[in-house]
């Protein structure tokens, strides 16, 4: 079941530096939300707060009604959160299939520890998850690469491996951190088609941090724009791109005045 997400007055301070200030917004189940803003706006820091890599200084973060501020990533994974990173975190010496299978360990009886100890009751579940992983790779057109070392594949395919690994955990909430970074135009179009298919086939909520506004326009139901750690506006991608405050944040007040 797709998750809801609610942030209320989230603040993040590192010493005297205010990275996030009073950020609040809600994401309904099944929505694709884009989190956008200029460099240094606080987008990845906010992702890190949601995914348990940073503990906010104050405020509330709830997933489907459960307070999760400051929770460990392992607890968030059990609640159905999965995340990709701007720079894929893969085991390059492992095969593509082995990398994808890492996403399924959270679903094993007893979790990753039982899998590592090779306890008997994990065998059936492990075989089922392996079959799912192979099906995901076939569906993505990557079945041919399942037994290849990950380091033999391109950056674009590394991005795909990380996405399929996240999906194998059966997430209710999926966070995609700059999924189009470093991709060619053709790879971006393929990514858009993939995310649309994921949405059509799975009951899932997706939040995307991205600078590629073509992708944001093609995929999102709504966007939240951050600037200097604050929420600047919320609305549709089209509304954001025509909002004078957003234009000023991206290109500067003088340039925005000249454009007007």
Placement of each model-derived feature along the sequence:
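Glycine-rich phosphate-binding loops of nucleotide-dependent enzymes
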Residues: 2-260
């Amino acid at each position: 079941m797709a998750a809801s997400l609610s942030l209320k007055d989230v603040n993040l301070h590192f010493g005297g530096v205010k990275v996030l200030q009073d950020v609040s917004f809600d994401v309904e189940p099944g929505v694709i939300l884009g989190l956008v803003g200029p460099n240094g706006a606080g987008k990845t820091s906010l992702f890190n707060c949601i995914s348990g890599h940073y503990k906010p200084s104050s405020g509330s973060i709830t997933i489907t009604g459960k307070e999760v501020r400051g929770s460990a990533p392992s607890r968030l994974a059990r609640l159905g959160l999965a995340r990709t990173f701007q720079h894929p975190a893969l085991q390059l010496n492992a095969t593509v299939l082995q990398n994808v299978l890492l996403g399924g360990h959270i679903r094993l009886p007893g979790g990753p520890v039982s899998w590592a100890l090779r306890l008997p009751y994990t065998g059936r579940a492990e075989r089922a998850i392996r079959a799912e992983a192979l099906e995901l790779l076939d569906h993505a057109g990557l079945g041919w690469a399942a037994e290849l070392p990950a380091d033999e594949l391109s950056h674009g395919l590394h991005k795909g491996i990380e996405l399929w690994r996240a999906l194998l955990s059966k997430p209710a909430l999926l966070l995609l951190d700059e999924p189009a970074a470093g991709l060619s135009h053709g790879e971006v179009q393929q990514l858009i088609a993939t995310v649309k298919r994921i949405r059509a086939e799975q009951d899932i909520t997706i939040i995307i941090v991205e600078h590629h506004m073509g992708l944001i326009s093609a995929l999102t139901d709504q966007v939240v724009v951050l600037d200097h750690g604050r929420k600047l506006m919320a609305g549709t991608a089209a509304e954001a791109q025509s909002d004078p405050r957003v234009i000023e944040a991206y290109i500067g007040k003088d340039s925005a005045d000249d454009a007007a």
